[in-house]
A protein has these predicted regions:
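Short, hydrophobic alpha-helical segments
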Residues: 111-112
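Short acidic-hydrophobic, aromatic-tinged amphipathic segments that line or gate anion-handling sites
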Residues: 99-103
């Protein structure tokens, strides 16, 4: 299954709508796609997590690897976390380091200087 089901741009921000499952394969693809976006000059990536219904430890690892690879090259943020996904990210401590928003509008505005 692909890591995301839709890609769109809103101004300088690329929004990737994640697929319902985030496992090793999807996490690896997500890392590859986000790296490609950064290589092509995009500096703002927003992950729409509203469809995610399952994430395993390898999916968490892929998400973390993606976030770490963005580093100083750009910004990666999340929005629309379902309760299950939010709880997983809280337990793992990732919500302390990753910016997340409930609303796409707030998330998009957070990229403004």
């Amino acid at each position: 299954m692909p890591a995301f089901v839709n890609e769109r741009r809103v101004g300088p921000v690329t929004i990737l709508e994640l697929a319902p499952r985030l496992t090793h394969a999807e996490g690896s693809e997500l890392h590859h796609v986000v790296s490609g976006l950064l290589d092509s000059g995009s500096q703002a990536v927003l992950l729409d997590c509203s469809r995610v219904t399952f994430i395993d430890s390898l999916g968490i690892g892929g998400l973390m690897r993606t976030w770490l690879s963005v580093g100083k090259r750009g910004k990666l943020k999340l929005f629309g976390l379902p309760p299950y996904f939010r709880q997983v990210l809280q337990i793992t401590g990732l919500l302390k380091v990753m910016d997340s928003f409930d609303d796409v509008g707030l998330a998009l505005r957070s990229f403004e200087p």
